[in-house]
Every structure is written in structure tokens, then in C-alpha cells.
Design a protein with these regions (language model features):
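Cytosolic-side transmembrane-helix boundaries in multi-pass membrane proteins
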Residues: 1-34, 40-44, 237, 244-251, ...
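Membrane-interfacial amphipathic/re-entrant helices at transmembrane-helix boundaries
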Residues: 2-80, 122-123, 127
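Single transmembrane alpha-helix segments in multi-pass membrane proteins
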Residues: 41-48, 56, 61-116, 129, ...
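Helix-loop-helix "hairpin" substructures at the membrane interface of multi-pass membrane proteins
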Residues: 118, 138, 200-278, 302-307
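Transmembrane helix-bundle core of multi-pass membrane transporters
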Residues: 154-225, 278, 332, 362-363, ...
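Transmembrane alpha-helical segments in multi-pass inner-membrane proteins
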Residues: 258-264, 268-338
Length: 369
């Protein structure tokens, strides 16, 4: 009898695993299918052949080693911002402030890169990367503390901090940190010792891509093999139960927000030290918000994040060249990305709205009681 029960339980476990796999697969395939159908309709409307254009995009994104390098280079910042988003969403914290942490982390790393002496040699690069991650962690630690201690809505606080980050970095790059030897809106160049090496010269793919993969590996190990990772997942599933079994919910919230800022700031640092070499207005074209879409497309899983980042990187790298070889404008890529982001917004609403409703209900109960 016990063997039969064990077999049934094993079968149920396998069934649940297959079900979760199918759900993730559908969650990846459906937004992509709809996005490309919308893009195909737009192409037909302007008299283009969708099959030919999509084949051209695939060729431009993955046709040879140089094009693959360009795609991976475009995907690199998204590896960081998607992990920074996923680590919070997995814990039930709706952090939309990754863009701000990316900006301040990037500026912090670049600041050290041109102010510390070049004589530090090989020590300069890790110092800059670490400082960028630290500033990013502090940046998002603050709204995490406000949420944990005073229940300040994290969606509002982190969204507003994006504007604060843009304002602060914009002021500094146009004022105290403005380069004396360049035009407006740029800092001085970092020392050569602070730059991340190129992986496939003359392409722009740099070692930040490898750092991004290490960040995803660290995220996966943290989720599956650390007590704090299990506690964060439990908080995301059911805060009341987490409290009942002794998990510090406020402490977990502060931790995941700080870790999110760490990854986002590290991403900004890698982008600055490997791609830009200086900070300027327009340092980020919205990597934080695109990372949100990547994380949701990948269902917060490490492999899903890699897939989503490479997909968006392919769209970005191919989009800049297809308009040179066809009559298709760059807006086609925006259509595909925008449709995926609509699905991401729907997913955020599906998760966040009930959670916010439960939070307000608890607040009303507390006020009434």
C-alpha cells in the first residue's frame, strides 16, 4: 500500500512539474506570437512581406559572429536589470525603480573611474564595479525600508525615485562633473585601467556580458540554495504564513530591495565601464523598464531572463540595420517590443492589483479594529 501511495505522490509531483513547465512555455510563447502577428499586420499594411523581413531580422541578429556579438552586447544591460526586477517580483515586492538604480550606479562607477589614480592598476576596475553596485543597493534600500517599516507604497516611491535619479545625474553631468574637454552633458573619460575588456574586438561586446551571466547564476543559486532565497519566495507566496513560521517579512523586503539595487547598480557600472566610458545624458534609453518586460517574459527564471534579454538584444541590434536594407522603419522593432511590454504590464496588473487590494483591506481592518 505504501508503495502505491508513493507512486501516486511521485506521479502527482511529475504532473505538477510538467504543468508548471507548460505554463512557463505558454507564458513565453503567447506574447511573442501576438507581437510578431501585430508586426506582420503592420508590414502587410505598408506592402512588405513579413516572412522576408523577419528572415532579414534573424540574419542581422545572428547571421555571423560579428552580428551575434552585437546582439549579446545589446542584451548585456538587460541581464542586470531583469535580474534586479525578478528578485523583487519573486518576493511579492513591486519594484519599478531599477532604472534609477542603474543610472546612479553607472555614474558612481564612472566617477571613480576618472577620479581615482590610474596607478591603482588592476584594482581600479573592481573598485569601480563594486562602488556602482553599492550605490545602487543604497538607492533601493531606502524605499525598501520605507515599505517595510511604514508601508509606503513601493510602486509610487520607486517610480518617483527614477525621476529623482534622472534629475541628480543630469545636474551632476551638466555641472560639477562636466568635462572641460568635451561638449555639454558628458563627464571626463574613465582611465583605461577602469575599462572592461572587449571580448570580440572590434565589436562592442565586453566582459560585462560575462558579469551579467554570473549575476544570473548568483540569482539562481540564491533562489534555490540559500535560506534567505527560500524565505523571499515564501514572503512572495504568502506573507501571513511567512510570519507564522518565523520569517522576518520586513527584513526580507529590505534585503530583496537592496539586492535589486545591487544588481541594477552593477549593471549601470558595467554599461559605463564597458560600453560608454563616460556618463552623459541618455546614458540609459530605458534599460530598467525594458528589464521589467524581460523579467516578466521569462517568468523571473534565470533561463527565461537570458532568453528574454537575448531576444530584446536581437531586436535592438537588427532594428538598427534592417532600415538600411529595406523600406521598413525602425518603428517595427518598437511595435514588437511595445506589444511584449503590454503583455508585461497586464502580467504586473494581474499580480499587483489583487495584492494591493489585500493590503488596503488589511489597512481598513486595522483602522476599524
Amino acid at each position: 500500500m505504501s508503495d502505491a501511495v508513493a507512486q501516486r505522490e511521485t506521479a502527482r509531483g511529475v504532473g505538477r512539474g510538467v504543468g508548471r513547465g507548460l505554463e512557463r512555455g505558454i507564458g513565453l510563447a503567447l506574447p511573442l506570437a501576438v507581437s510578431f502577428l501585430v508586426a506582420a499586420a503592420a508590414l502587410l499594411a505598408i506592402g512588405e512581406n513579413p516572412a522576408e523581413i523577419f528572415a532579414l531580422m534573424a540574419e542581422e541578429a545572428f547571421g555571423n559572429a560579428r552580428r551575434i556579438a552585437a546582439t549579446l552586447s545589446a542584451a548585456t544591460p538587460l541581464l542586470f536589470t531583469a535580474v534586479a526586477t525578478a528578485i523583487c517580483f519573486r518576493s511579492g515586492v513591486f519594484n519599478v525603480g531599477v532604472e534609477g538604480a542603474f543610472l546612479v550606479g553607472g555614474l558612481a562607477a564612472i566617477f571613480l573611474g576618472f577620479t581615482l589614480p590610474a596607478g591603482l592598476g588592476f584594482l581600479l576596475l573592481p573598485l569601480c564595479l563594486g562602488f556602482g553596485g553599492l550605490i545602487g543597493a543604497i538607492w533601493l534600500w531606502a524605499p525598501g525600508l520605507l515599505l517595510a517599516r511604514y508601508e509606503v507604497d513601493e510602486v509610487v516611491s520607486t517610480l518617483m525615485l527614477n525621476f529623482v535619479a534622472a534629475g541628480i545625474t543630469g545636474y551632476l553631468v551638466n555641472g560639477p562633473l562636466l568635462s572641460d574637454y568635451a561638449g555639454n552633458n558628458v563627464t571626463p573619460l574613465i582611465h583605461e585601467a577602469a575599462t572592461l575588456p572587449r571580448l570580440m574586438p572590434p565589436s562592442t561586446l565586453h566582459a560585462g556580458f560575462l558579469v551579467g551571466l554570473l549575476a544570473i547564476l548568483a540569482y539562481g543559486l540564491w533562489c534555490r540554495h540559500t535560506p534567505s532565497g527560500f524565505e523571499a519566495a515564501l514572503v512572495g507566496l504568502n506573507k501571513r504564513f511567512a510570519r507564522a513560521v518565523g520569517v522576518s517579512v520586513p527584513g526580507t523586503i529590505v534585503l530583496v530591495m537592496a539586492l535589486s539595487g545591487l544588481f541594477a547598480g552593477l549593471g549601470g557600472a558595467a554599461h559605463g565601464l564597458g560600453q560608454m566610458y563616460r556618463f552623459s545624458d541618455g546614458f540609459s534609453p530605458g534599460y530598467g523598464f525594458t528589464g521589467l518586460a524581460v523579467a516578466l517574459l521569462g517568468r523571473n527564471s534565470p533561463w527565461g531572463i537570458i532568453f528574454g534579454a537575448v531576444l530584446f538584444g536581437a531586436l535592438a541590434s537588427a532594428g538598427t540595420t534592417i532600415q538600411l536594407f529595406s523600406n521598413v522603419p525602425l518603428d517595427l522593432v518598437n511595435i514588437i517590443q511595445g506589444t511584449v511590454m503590454i503583455f508585461a504590464a497586464v502580467e504586473v496588473g494581474r499580480i499587483a492589483v489583487p495584492a494591493l487590494g489585500r493590503r488596503r483591506k488589511r489597512e481598513r481592518t486595522a483602522d476599524g479594529g
